[in-house]
Every structure is written in C-alpha cells, then in structure tokens.
C-alpha cells in the first residue's frame, strides 16, 4: 500500500485554533507533537502549529495541557521537550492528561 496516508490535525500554538488537517504518506509521517509553520486563519499570520494524532503519545489533550501551562514561548516554540515538561509538571503535582 504505497499510497496509504495518515491524516494529522494541527493546532495553532499561539491561539489554540484548529488548523487545516494534512494527510501525509505513511513513510513521510512526522512524530506526533511535531511543530510546523502554517498560516493561522484566526491570527492572520504564519505561526507554529502542533501536530496532534489521537491514540498516540501526543493528542489534542496533550497540546491543550502544554499550552495551558505555558510550554510555548512568544514565537510558539517549545521551551522544554514535551517529555521533560510533563515530568516537571508531574513533580509540581499538576494532574497530567
């Protein structure tokens, strides 16, 4: 099945709005949580969007958690790797998704 593709959802790291989903060929798929520059219709400019895939280690709930607790800087880049960020929040007693 060389034409098999997987669809990912993307969410703007600045405003949290769902962007346009992208289908990738299985061999070209990125890891869940990957950041990609896409145009955000709400922000009106190109921003980093987090790639979310349900039933993986990085879903929409993980994105919401990371955004709510401030793991993106003013340029929508991650401050800490998501695994390190989860560990830090767990050590602070924050409920994880």
Regions found by a protein language model. Name each.
Residues 9, 20-22:
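Short, low-complexity N-terminal segments with a bias toward positive charge
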Residues 42-45, 51:
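Short, charge-rich amphipathic interface segments used for partner binding and complex assembly
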């Amino acid at each position: 099945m060389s034409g098999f593709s997987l669809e990912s959802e993307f969410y703007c790291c600045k405003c949290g709005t769902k962007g346009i989903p992208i289908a990738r060929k299985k061999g070209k798929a990125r890891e869940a949580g990957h950041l990609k520059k896409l145009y955000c219709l709400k922000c009106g400019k190109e921003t980093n969007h987090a790639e979310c895939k349900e039933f993986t280690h990085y879903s929409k709930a993980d994105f919401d958690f990371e955004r709510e607790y401030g793991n993106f800087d003013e340029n929508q880049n991650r401050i800490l790797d998501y695994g390190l960020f989860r560990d830090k929040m767990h050590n602070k007693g924050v409920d994880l998704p």
